[in-house]
Every structure is written in C-alpha cells, then in structure tokens.
Amino acid sequence: MVILLVSGPVSRRDLLCDTAIQILAVEGGRGLTHRAIDREAGVPIGTTKNYFPTRESILTACAARMTALHQAAVERLRETTPPAINASDVAELYPALLRRAVADDPTQMLAMVELYLEAVRRPGVREALSGMVLANAGAGAALQQAAGLPSTVRDTGLLDAYFLGVAISLLALPVETLRTVGLDDPYALGIGVFSATVPSTDAGSGDRSVESG
C-alpha cells in the first residue's frame, strides 16, 4: 500500500521531512543535503541541520515520517472498510494502488526505494521502515480476513513484497521491455500480485486493461 502525504498545516519538522522525501524521489540519495532541504522548504539555511544534525538522522526521520503517514492511511482504511466487503473488492484495490504508485504520483514509491537501499547500511532507517511493513501486513491481513479470506501476515507481507518489486520494475524499465516480458498491463499486474498470495481466490476479471499513462 502506498502512502500519501497529508494536506493541511504541518509542523516545521514534518515540513522538512516532507521536503526531504520529495528530494529523495527526484534526485535520489546523493541529492539529499541539509542545504538542499533548506532551499526547497524555503527556510533559512541551517534550519535542517538544527533539526537533523547528520545525514543519517535525516534519512531516519524520513522513514519515520513515511511510516507515520502510512499508519494513518491504514487507520483510515480500517475506518472506511464496508462490512460487506468481499475478496473481489479487496483484489480491486491493488490495480488502483499500483496505478497511483507508478503513474499518478510516484513520489512516495521512489522515495521508499531510496530508503530501502539506505536501510541496508543504516540500522536506524531499517528500524523505522520495519514499522511500516508490520503495520501494512497486519492491516492487510485484517482486511482480507474481513472479506472472508484465511490470510495471515505472511500472506500479506509477501503480497507487499511482490507489489514493491512490480512497482520498481514499472518505474525503472523501458516500455518495450515491460511489454516483452508481459509487465505492461497494470490492471492485470495488480490483480496478479493479489491472486499470487491468495491462490484460492478467483478475484477480478483479469481481462481488463488499464492504460499506464
């Protein structure tokens, strides 16, 4: 599940984190500096360094911010899930999430990829991201169980891992390559990552095509 940045007033700390997330998405980890965040956030030079003295503290704060936003989104999903939800309804979420993550606004997905890479070398980032993974797996399992599926956190954790891999491929590979290997239909891919972890479910029609542009 992909996080969306919240609208409305935010604290200066959150503003700096949101700005850093945008920079990660656009310029990658190498573009993430204290001065770059200050400039993009429109705050006096030195502000970011006062809040986050080291680069690692910036990255850890970004991961924590994304986790907090994600957990808020998960809570909203819980609150708005209709009682009569079924397996097909749940399956249909994934093509929509994939399209949003790749075509509509890839900022969060691109930043997440950068943070995953940083987490390999930085325990603080790794710990912050683990909260997002655990919250998502738990919420996904609860949602699928509400739809009558015997899903576990392992199933939904695997689903999220599949989703992340597919999203990265769609963002990184040329259209011709995606077409050649059969990864050019976001709708089918969204249904596919769901069905791959819930093999007993005949969810979705599987024959709809959603334009990736």
Task: Say what each PLM segment does.
Residues 1-7, 150:
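Short, intrinsically disordered or compositionally biased N-terminal tails of bacterial proteins
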Residues 15, 19-61:
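Helix-turn-helix
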Residues 15, 19-26, 72-76, 80, ...:
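Solvent-exposed, amphipathic alpha-helical segments
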Residues 64-70:
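Short, basic, alpha-helical segments at the C-terminal edge of helix-turn-helix-like DNA-binding modules
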Residues 74-109, 156-159:
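Hydrophobic alpha-helical connector segments
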Residues 81, 119, 170-174:
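Secondary-structure edge/capping motif, primarily at the C-terminal ends of alpha-helices
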Residues 103-113, 120-147, 157:
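Amphipathic alpha-helical packing segments from all-alpha helical-bundle domains
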Residues 126, 130, 145-213:
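Hydrophobic/aromatic-rich alpha-helical bundle segments in the mid-to-C-terminal region
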